[in-house]
Amino acid sequence: MGKTNVSHKLYITLLAGGMGKRMQSNLPKVLHKVNGETMIVRLMKQVIKLNPDKILVVVGKFYSEISSEIKQHINDNRIEFVVQKEPLGTGDAVKCTLPLLINDNIDNIILNGDVPMIQHSTIKNIYNYYLETKSKLLITSIHLSNPTGCGRIILDENFGFSEIIEEKDCTEDQKKLTLVNCGIYVCNSKILKQSIPQISNNNSQKEYYLTDLVKIYNNEPSNNINLFILPRNKEIEIYNINTKEQLEYIESVSK
């Protein structure tokens, strides 16, 4: 992917520090294999095709195992590993990367490490839309026939983005909405450095959620948040794997 925006650097951040408890395995979640290849390596191979300036891989207690797996299959000096010392949530994971954002002209694509089916062309389309709309923060969404378990996207009266509401906080009417958050964000480094430190852990899990970045920045008077809606046929690409059953499903449809 040639640099569409020559004045801005492009960083891609992969959140791979999750414990993956629901996998019921001693193996880190992103090291589970989809048809013979680990999730993280599959994802890395797609990300590299975007020709970013840097790839930040946020890891936790399994730093050694995950970094070893990546280095075994991919030799690229643009990869940097960022250690999240405690599993305090996705917002904290991104906070760990802030010291590496050395200036305000870095575009950051942030995505989870457990979406092994995503294609570089899809990520490229998301980033191009971010550039075309001159966004400061872009949220990726999709309509799902079964949105159970996903955060819902709330639109304003002009059908623009309003907020993300996690399912547990949704009213019965909001649960009927099918437009959901994909967990893929594009954001300017200046916004990250301003907003991420404001995220609190005032929730039942005592974790710092990346979705709170949206709430915080949405309160800024000059915010420029845009929404990119993926076509429905991309559902398999943004499918998060959290359980063995989900892993088996992805393997069955990707052969």
UniProtKB/Swiss-Prot annotation:
Catalytic activity from the UniProt record: N-acetyl-alpha-D-glucosamine 1-phosphate + UTP + H(+) = UDP-N-acetyl-alpha-D-glucosamine + diphosphate
EC number: 2.7.7.23
Associated pathway: Nucleotide-sugar biosynthesis; UDP-N-acetyl-alpha-D-glucosamine biosynthesis; UDP-N-acetyl-alpha-D-glucosamine from N-acetyl-alpha-D-glucosamine 1-phosphate: step 1/1
Annotated InterPro entries: GlmU-like, NTP_transferase_dom, Nucleotide-diphossugar_trans
Keywords per UniProt: Nucleotidyltransferase, Transferase
Keyword Cell wall biogenesis/degradation in annotation: no
UniProt enzyme class: transferase
Keyword Transmembrane: no
A Pfam short name: NTP_transferase
GO BP term, pick one: UDP-N-acetylglucosamine biosynthetic process
GO molecular function: UDP-N-acetylglucosamine diphosphorylase activity
Protein name, as recorded: Probable UDP-N-acetylglucosamine pyrophosphorylase
